Design a protein with these regions (language model features):
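Cytoplasm-proximal transmembrane signaling helix
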Residues: 257, 262-317, 321-322
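Sensory-module boundary signal marking interfaces of small helical input modules
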Residues: 4, 184-187, 265
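Extreme N-terminal signal-anchor transmembrane helix of membrane signaling/transducer proteins, especially
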Residues: 1-36, 40
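Extracytoplasmic/periplasmic ligand-binding sensor regions of membrane-associated signaling proteins
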Residues: 103-179, 186-187, 191
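Short, hydrophobic beta-strand elements of compact beta-sandwich sensory domains
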Residues: 164, 171-181, 240-276
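Soluble sensory domains of the PAS superfamily and closely related sensory modules
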Residues: 135-147, 221-238
Length: 324
């Protein structure tokens, strides 16, 4: 092998070695940045989605508070000994507009109900005797608390906001707003694709919402129902193949989880690598070209001297010598 070729190989190898190290380090850093950016994007999306749902629940919470302190509602709750005609007149002229009109302005409202000890006869769906509250699915597990309590039933597709009204430490009435499940969680449904999924749970870990577009993600065994798993169990399965983030509601005790397939995140990293490959190949060709050029320059005089010596060995007495 000629000296020039050896020198070319030496120059190319010594140039490629640091370039390879630099390329690997750069790719590693970019991969880390991409993964971090993906996680930040997920958190940002989840925060915006949570704010969208919170803004809805805040509206209905404000409506519930308004109705709770409405003088007309207070009058209906306090007046217990009135004749049926007067009661019917108050119900139709006062209570019905208060409890029915908001439904025409908010398409997520299914109904607004007042359960009161003063109501003796049920009036349509708006005014109901207090003892009939126990027949409602959401009455189970209610706390003795004047703050708004949120209940979700995924099977019925219903979300309710309940407020207890007390008089002298005795339950006097209950106001309840029933909301459409799909409309309340629509902001979360809108961000879901075939690469991610979302979960909403309460502070006890009960799953209130669970949807995923990942077909290969199996969250339940064949003998398990969707409602039988807690949020922690679901997350332990999700963590095996996905990256997830969480945020808490500011309006109630809901916790929002948003997860994305690790393959989808790795796909972003692979796209960066594919973008880097042409640059790496171009750098390789440049190094090869420079190696050939420099080795030719460095060995030109040596090759001329070798040629002259070869001529002398063959009996030539004419030698060309040039000096720089």
């Amino acid at each position: 092998m000629k000296y020039r070729h050896k020198l070319t190989i030496l120059l190319v190898v010594t140039s490629l070695a640091p370039m390879t190290v630099l390329a690997l380090y750069s790719h590693s850093r970019q991969s880390t940045m991409v993964r971090s950016s993906e996680l930040e994007d997920m958190q940002s999306i989840m925060e915006q989605t949570k704010e969208g749902i919170d803004s809805q629940t805040a509206v209905y919470a404000s409506l519930l508070n308004y109705l709770t302190y409405s003088p007309d509602i207070e009058e209906i709750i306090k007046e217990k000994n009135i004749d049926n005609y007067t009661a019917y007149e108050k119900y139709t002229e006062i209570a019905d507009p208060l409890l029915s009109v908001p439904k025409s302005y908010h398409d997520a409202i299914n109904r607004i109900q007042l359960f009161a000890d003063s109501i003796q006869v049920e009036h349509e769906y708006t005014l109901v005797p207090l003892d009939k509250m126990q027949e409602e699915w959401w009455s189970e597990g209610l706390k003795d608390d004047v703050r708004i309590q949120w209940k979700v039933d995924r099977t019925r597709g219903e979300v309710v906001a309940v407020r207890m009204i007390y008089a002298q430490q005795k339950l006097n009435a209950v106001l309840c707003i029933s909301l459409d499940y799909d409309k309340i969680f629509q902001p979360l449904t809108n961000i879901l694709t075939d690469e991610n999924g979302g979960i909403v749970a309460d502070q006890d870990g009960n799953v209130l919402y669970n949807k995923t577009g990942l077909k290969e993600l199996k969250l339940f065994d064949d003998n398990e129902k969707d409602t039988s798993q807690t949020a922690d169990k679901l997350l332990s399965k999700i963590s095996q193949t996905c990256t997830w983030t969480q945020t808490e509601s500011e309006e109630n005790d809901w916790v929002f989880y948003f997860y994305k397939s690790q393959d989808a995140i790795s796909g972003s990293v692979r796209r960066i690598l594919l973008e880097e490959i042409p640059l790496i190949i171009a750098c390789g060709f440049i190094i090869l070209f420079l190696g050939l050029s420099f080795s030719r320059i460095f060995t030109r005089k040596i090759e001329e001297l070798t040629k002259n010596m070869d001529q002398v060995n063959h009996g030539s007495r004419e030698v060309t010598v040039s000096s720089d």
